[in-house]
């Protein structure tokens, strides 16, 4: 121990500079350091700190000055088995100087420390081999940034090549390595390599132990452990190399032990204080991993893995070396002979010890570790966590030496969240039974060969059609097909799929097409190897070398210190020749014949290599070098200076150069087992061969994919389709039932029996994409059949839509695989064309050259035959050019300074162009100008959009991928959020099926770092089109061979199973994306019947092999199951910009008849009671004229009531009547009865107080109903008639009525009748001429509010039926505020106020003297001053209890008010007041004009014919009841007058859009019911209109205060959306009102907002209120009653098992609308809004809308956000619901994007949107 420490101390003392060194842990060995060793190390550290020079290194100066090249035979220079010492090195430089021609360098072998020690027994041989193999390093893949000299890639490569493995026990001295030989000599360095400071006595020279350059003490003061290059002690390195070491350790942290991790932390702490201007910051590539790889699906998830990863190349290389060890081979054979096949680990150790194979147990374990690494021994139950030998495990001897690289991969585990499909019981059998069953099945299965031939035949037919299509698309001769098929089939069939790496799966990476113009097409051939355009660097170099040794250099061979850094010429002259001679010596130590360099080579180096007879090729493309590296299986050396291990050279059969018509090609042919091919294309021009190359590349891809795909189809026992499938096989959606599949197979027979009309319908809705290779031929066959005309007609005749896409699609092959059926784009289906969102997208949604070429290249008058010959610019090409000038054609012999030449040149310049002069573009006709503008637009369209019908754009599979841990009893969480992956077939995001199973499925005991739960509980889900594939794991108990992947499947419907067989080598290399594509679109495949069942006539499963079967892969004790399940895809329904109001359903006649019957009985009872009271009076005053006239008036009222009832009966029996007609008639009938009760009740009370003397002198006369009609008609002629309200919630008589017009009614207001009766009585008084006495009597008969009505009313007390009639009859209820709003909107006062506001608005733009404003009070007072408004029981005024002023006072007040209003801005609100004998109402309408304007654009009333009710009412008005009074009694006669007699004064119907929308809104608001809306926390009360169209929400005072400044901006935003036709999610507000109801003992005042009901007409099963927050957003449905509104967390929990998938176009519209609306709300400081979502499963629609968007971020909300965000109130650290508007907006957008997931389809990314 002491001697060793002293030796270490002596070797270390020259490796440190004085005081700038940082101490590191000196001992990195596994054994603990003794106390004496620690003391020695301490003394050594103190000594190192005081040592100031490291320039003189023992035995290094002399050797470093030597520049002779060296060569290592067989192994690396540092791990050679030769016993030659360093003293035996010959001085080649001296000998070369004395000879005429330089000779290749001699062989050099170096002995390592471990080899000099040796062992004394033969039993150590295996251990030595093991130790030696542990020291062997392989070169990693090259990087693209490699430069000569001390660059990032060079040093990284240097470190990665020499980094030590886990065995650190065998370290050596730095002097025993070859690094010191390649140091820069001291005599060649005059300044520091980094800072360029001159060396002097005080600035000494220091060599970096890694790069070998010379630095000053400041630039070389870092220390790294020598174990990174398997040296003992520490190494002194420059700052640059120290940082590179740190970067390397960080990039491979998973491979480090504890000591290495401590080193990394120590280096990080040291270097973090370095300035940002260091050389490391100048190389951003250092931040990347040194071994980049292609992105794949697995690569996205490798962060889940908790296992260390190892480089596959290093393991393979190590294993190959170990397998070549004779001692291990002999030991393996002896152990197989003497031991059983399976043994315990302890038994193997005992065997080695007992047979003298090892001296102790440690050596035995080392030998067994070597056997494990070589593949001679493997555990029975593989455990990826246990990489080394374990005596407690059981092992078996392996016959196969193939490397099992899967244990180094990152695992992924999932479990199915749904009911796990269980395999049939027959599958539970041992591996031996499966093997026997497989052999019997394959031997006896005579269907295997038949299936193969059928599959091949179908593909060949498909390939021919695909090739012909591509040749036509590229304007190529069809004769190319035979040539291309021969070339591609040779390459695809001979290339071995296992040669593909996971990063380069596409065969086109291994087969290159080279264009060689000239020759004949049949001269095209396949070269087994690589061919490219290049020549040798010098003509004296050999151009033909049989069996060459090829070296690939990525770095330049030049002297360049730092790229881009200035350097003095003295240093270059001093060091360049020495440096290049040293580099060439390193190159020649590898003995190459051909050297290819990616960059340039200095002239000195070229001469040196030429003198050694080396063929040099310069400036080779990196892609060519990579292809050579793959084909020849050699390394690309990134740096000669830092490469200390033996690089792997390339070997081939022949190297030669050929010249083809001036094009020089360089060939590297490898005839045996080539890993690459080159196809030489000949027989055309360069332009033609460019197009041929594209076609050939696509054909090669298709042929190679089918080779792998067919192999998998045979493994899964797939049954090929019938030879003649129907061309109408393509459904617009994926098949869902087996019945559809059966009908699909029989559809050709069905089509023959269908009529022509039926066939036309089928074809128009189902257009196949002709992916099936037999469909095109079937289409040609059907084109000649009798069914052809209707088919062609169905495809061609579609006037409303552009049919170019579907027509082109019907004759285009999109897939390289046969028998795949793709659904049409949703927006191109009939259902998609009719959806609401279709109008938001362009009419031509997809672009294709198939029709754009026609519009661009061919004029309208050009025939079809000339279409292919024309080109975009041929119109200009056909122009006649002017003759060329003489100067262009003359031969110039005189100098340019001569006068003749100058004069000719001047004349040529003034000559002008050769194109004929035409009109200026601005003066051309419009048609030509339009063509000039459109041409570049079409060309740019080809550049902007992808061709949707190009098969190359369909060689991908867009999927929605996610991974999550599903816990049905707890909380689930995403480990990988759903993300859209565009999986390119055999390219980006794709992975081999075998690699996918090995890396992410078949590994145990892996924990997810995201959720820290076992990966076995995780789910991996791939969603595409209308289905998804779940991948989940189970434990495989069959004990199958762990080196093979077994496959089986079983039907989930009938439990039919396929035999368990090993997956073939070709099937293992199938693309995962192609496998998933078959699961999504290959539903036509069925299970191939076994031969035994076919012979015995047994039943065969007819279910889809890819839709109904569960696929099971078993590997190393783990079973991976793939199950396809259909998904529910939703269409979104946003709030429409225009709300279409529907016409109510007609009443049920029987029910209404019963209601009318009951109502008529009640009315007759009322009139009978009045008759009885009058009859009682008549007994006392038998001959009283007053009694007679009372009877006449009662008869008149009864007649009017009877007319109203008859109108209702007539409407019920007329089919033309609408619900509006019936409802209006019922409302007027109720109003007539209510008016009679109000009049006759008080009147009968007063009759008892009158004497008969005051009435018996009235003479008898005649009274007719015409005289009883009012003289003044106050109803609006042009107004609409609406329905009245219902007495009961479900009363059908009160449903809204038709939107009709009405003239003057027979039943006018009660006051009008009183006025008419007063006139009648005044004209019939004969006895008493004193009218005052008569008026006094009638005044006493008027109803009084202080009296109690003796007549009992059949209507509820809170109903008010006798208010002044407006545009339509409205039934006002005290408890229903919506009826008060409806009455206010239809009242005459509201219309007058709107007109006044309009007049004021117009007056603002004109002179105030020209227009007089009519105040509301004035208009009301004028109305009240009329005789018809004299009754106090039906009074209207501007405010409750307002007194009626005199005309003079009102006029003066109105003038004063008008002057004040001119000064003040007009208020946008209108306040209306009205009352009757028992109640006062007031309604304030906010922003009346603005809401009217918005409603006129947003509400669309139903289109109705002329009201039938109005015609009937006019007809009844012409009926007169003539009543004759005589002493004997009354005589009545019904007389019908002509239509123009007695008709009311009407005006023509002027359609007013605002009024129509307002009346339509009032019809819905006339009746509402309470609605218990759940989910909100505001506590507001809600109501819904009876027709379910609108929602009324109560608003508090704070909401009203916020709404007033917000409303103008809201109107502007909605108007802009309507003008620009931009969809919005904001639920529209149709009015805000404040309603007050005042009675004697109560007063109610509420503010109400009227909004649209988002769920109108929808069958909503689930409702969600989403805010984007997950804090307290969970509802327990079990604890809720009634209507349940779920929240965010409920939706998240549902997304694990049943996410909300939406179509792609729906997600596009939804995302834009959310972004636009949330931005608008953010600008107005609005937050806390919600997205209301309803699931209409019946129609497959998500109904959405944003609600509660009034609340702003006020002070109280700020305080709430701060308190909840602090965590004082809990919340589990989640973001509070209420945050500032900017933050709320972003969170809302992100959450909605997560909640609604897009389901990609085949057409994802190909549309113009």
Curated annotation (Swiss-Prot):
<feature type="compositionally biased region" description="Low complexity">
    <location>
        <begin position="1426"/>
        <end position="1452"/>
    </location>
</feature>
<keyword id="KW-0547">Nucleotide-binding</keyword>
<keyword id="KW-0472">Membrane</keyword>
<feature type="modified residue" description="Phosphothreonine">
    <location>
        <position position="760"/>
    </location>
</feature>
<feature type="zinc finger region" description="FYVE-type">
    <location>
        <begin position="186"/>
        <end position="246"/>
    </location>
</feature>
<feature type="region of interest" description="Disordered">
    <location>
        <begin position="399"/>
        <end position="444"/>
    </location>
</feature>
<feature type="region of interest" description="Disordered">
    <location>
        <begin position="856"/>
        <end position="876"/>
    </location>
</feature>
<dbReference type="InterPro" id="IPR044769">
    <property type="entry name" value="PIKfyve_PIPKc"/>
</dbReference>
<dbReference type="InterPro" id="IPR036390">
    <property type="entry name" value="WH_DNA-bd_sf"/>
</dbReference>
<feature type="compositionally biased region" description="Low complexity">
    <location>
        <begin position="1"/>
        <end position="12"/>
    </location>
</feature>
<keyword id="KW-0067">ATP-binding</keyword>
<protein>
    <recommendedName>
        <fullName>Putative 1-phosphatidylinositol 3-phosphate 5-kinase</fullName>
        <ecNumber>2.7.1.150</ecNumber>
    </recommendedName>
</protein>
<feature type="modified residue" description="Phosphoserine">
    <location>
        <position position="755"/>
    </location>
</feature>
<dbReference type="GO" id="GO:0097352">
    <property type="term" value="P:autophagosome maturation"/>
</dbReference>
<dbReference type="InterPro" id="IPR000306">
    <property type="entry name" value="Znf_FYVE"/>
</dbReference>
<feature type="compositionally biased region" description="Polar residues">
    <location>
        <begin position="1272"/>
        <end position="1287"/>
    </location>
</feature>
<feature type="binding site">
    <location>
        <position position="195"/>
    </location>
    <ligand>
        <name>Zn(2+) 1</name>
    </ligand>
</feature>
<keyword id="KW-0862">Zinc</keyword>
<feature type="binding site">
    <location>
        <position position="211"/>
    </location>
    <ligand>
        <name>Zn(2+) 2</name>
    </ligand>
</feature>
<dbReference type="InterPro" id="IPR002423">
    <property type="entry name" value="Cpn60/GroEL/TCP-1"/>
</dbReference>
<dbReference type="GO" id="GO:0007033">
    <property type="term" value="P:vacuole organization"/>
</dbReference>
<feature type="region of interest" description="Catalytic">
    <location>
        <begin position="1552"/>
        <end position="1809"/>
    </location>
</feature>
<feature type="modified residue" description="Phosphoserine">
    <location>
        <position position="1530"/>
    </location>
</feature>
<keyword id="KW-0808">Transferase</keyword>
<feature type="compositionally biased region" description="Basic and acidic residues">
    <location>
        <begin position="856"/>
        <end position="874"/>
    </location>
</feature>
<dbReference type="InterPro" id="IPR027483">
    <property type="entry name" value="PInositol-4-P-4/5-kinase_C_sf"/>
</dbReference>
<feature type="binding site">
    <location>
        <position position="192"/>
    </location>
    <ligand>
        <name>Zn(2+) 1</name>
    </ligand>
</feature>
<comment type="function">
    <text>Regulates both the synthesis and turnover of phosphatidylinositol 3,5-bisphosphate (1,2-diacyl-sn-glycero-3-phospho-(1D-myo-inositol-3,5-bisphosphate) or PtdIns(3,5)P2). Catalyzes the phosphorylation of phosphatidylinositol 3-phosphate (1,2-diacyl-sn-glycero-3-phospho-(1D-myo-inositol-3-phosphate)) on the fifth hydroxyl of the myo-inositol ring, to form PtdIns(3,5)P2. Required for endocytic-vacuolar pathway and nuclear migration. Has a role at a late stage in endosome-related membrane trafficking, at a point when signal termination has occurred. Is not required for receptor silencing.</text>
</comment>
<feature type="region of interest" description="Disordered">
    <location>
        <begin position="1521"/>
        <end position="1554"/>
    </location>
</feature>
<feature type="binding site">
    <location>
        <position position="219"/>
    </location>
    <ligand>
        <name>Zn(2+) 1</name>
    </ligand>
</feature>
<feature type="region of interest" description="Disordered">
    <location>
        <begin position="1399"/>
        <end position="1465"/>
    </location>
</feature>
<dbReference type="GO" id="GO:0070772">
    <property type="term" value="C:PAS complex"/>
</dbReference>
<feature type="region of interest" description="Disordered">
    <location>
        <begin position="1269"/>
        <end position="1307"/>
    </location>
</feature>
<dbReference type="InterPro" id="IPR002498">
    <property type="entry name" value="PInositol-4-P-4/5-kinase_core"/>
</dbReference>
<dbReference type="GO" id="GO:0008270">
    <property type="term" value="F:zinc ion binding"/>
</dbReference>
<feature type="binding site">
    <location>
        <position position="216"/>
    </location>
    <ligand>
        <name>Zn(2+) 1</name>
    </ligand>
</feature>
<dbReference type="InterPro" id="IPR027409">
    <property type="entry name" value="GroEL-like_apical_dom_sf"/>
</dbReference>
<dbReference type="GO" id="GO:0010008">
    <property type="term" value="C:endosome membrane"/>
</dbReference>
<dbReference type="GO" id="GO:0052810">
    <property type="term" value="F:1-phosphatidylinositol-5-kinase activity"/>
</dbReference>
<feature type="compositionally biased region" description="Polar residues">
    <location>
        <begin position="84"/>
        <end position="127"/>
    </location>
</feature>
<dbReference type="GO" id="GO:0008333">
    <property type="term" value="P:endosome to lysosome transport"/>
</dbReference>
<feature type="compositionally biased region" description="Basic and acidic residues">
    <location>
        <begin position="431"/>
        <end position="444"/>
    </location>
</feature>
